From Swiss-Prot:
Chemical reaction(s) catalysed: (1S,2R)-1-C-(indol-3-yl)glycerol 3-phosphate + L-serine = D-glyceraldehyde 3-phosphate + L-tryptophan + H2O
Pathway of action: Amino-acid biosynthesis; L-tryptophan biosynthesis; L-tryptophan from chorismate: step 5/5
Subunit structure as annotated in this protein's UniProt entry: Tetramer of two alpha and two beta chains.
Active site, renumbered: 50, 61
Name this polypeptide is given: Tryptophan synthase alpha chain
Pfam assignment, any one: Trp_syntA
Keyword terms, alphabetized: Amino-acid biosynthesis, Aromatic amino acid biosynthesis, Lyase, Tryptophan biosynthesis
Gene: trpA
Family, per entry: Belongs to the TrpA family.
Record's function text: The alpha subunit is responsible for the aldol cleavage of indoleglycerol phosphate to indole and glyceraldehyde 3-phosphate.
CDD domains per the UniProt record, alphabetical: Tryptophan_synthase_alpha
Keyword Protein biosynthesis found: no
Broad EC category: lyase
Organism per entry: Sinorhizobium fredii (strain NBRC 101917 / NGR234)
Amino acid sequence: MTARMEQRFADVAAEGRPVLVTYFMGGDPDFETSLSIMQALPKAGADVIELGVPFSDPMADGPAIQLAGQRALKAGQTLAKTLELARRFRAEDQRTPIVLMGYYNPIYIYGVERFLNDAVEAGVDGLIVVDLPPEMDDELCIPALKKGISFIRLATPTTDDRRLPKVLENTSGFVYYVSMTGITGSALPDPSRIAGAVARIKSHTSLPVCVGFGVKTAEHARVIGASADGVVVGTAIVNQIASSLTEEGRVTEATVPGVEALVRGLSAGVRAARLAAAE
């Protein structure tokens, strides 16, 4: 785990609440607007930022994030420009961890060694690469860890106790528990099942466990945050951005403020989570 990531989780745990992890697609709807969104997230209460890298074949993404990726690609967003987003953000914010989330193909084409060097220079703290299983750790995970970049793995309801140790073997930063099988943006499952799943993962690792896929409202964040170390919100933010755009997909005056308002509400939800659990 990078020092910045470790410090952020420790600081938030000391406050007695879960971490709020916010995802958005880099370059959606354009570079400058997404930079403004990224800069607004911590001010609205985000603790960790997941910065999406657009890809033409995003197999794990639901319709909303697929459309966000298409908008970003249409606007000219690339992996290099996504690293530039991180670099520009990091010049003003030294404390908020950045996790790049995407697929292996753009990294492979960019060049693994070059990518990792540029990611370190840009201030990236972690990676989530959804199509690289543990059996392929030598491709990117191990080199990333050697550079000091966390490699965050996804666990799902179908990850059984035989598979889980392999998934966790080289995981660092935090574990991302996908609270349902399927694609992003699905409905939220039974909270009691999530609490049991978090406890099961924690019996195998000392890493924080963050829960995502399906978290859309402050109430969702409050319920999930009662048992998880962190709450991940993505589709709701992407939908908020999309709803603010013109029919042509261009930014409006409501785009950034709309995201800020949503994240402030989600932040209030995670801050109420442990209070609700204690009642």
